[in-house]
Amino acid sequence: MGKPTGFIEIKRREPDAQPPAERIRFYREFEIPLAESEVSRQGARCMDCGIPFCQSGCPVNNIIPDWNDLVYRNRWREASAVLHSTNNFPEFTGRICPAP
């Protein structure tokens, strides 16, 4: 699952956001997505917890550890299939997810 020491070695990174002065001019996405390489690095932070509370606590039962591992390994199509196996609308539910 991910990189065994990834949680320690790789600092958590959130997407940047456009400044408010820019985003008030339009109704588009204001988060600036991370590059694919950075998303993959973030996937390496997933630990083999034994009891993945991220998954058991997920209201839509996403298989988060498997998904993160596939992202870490750049297996994007498989990661998408795993995510869509439990969640038809990840782009919506991801915005209201209670986890940071």
Each language-model region and where it sits:
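Ferredoxin-type iron-sulfur electron-transfer modules and their immediate structural context
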Residues: M1-P100
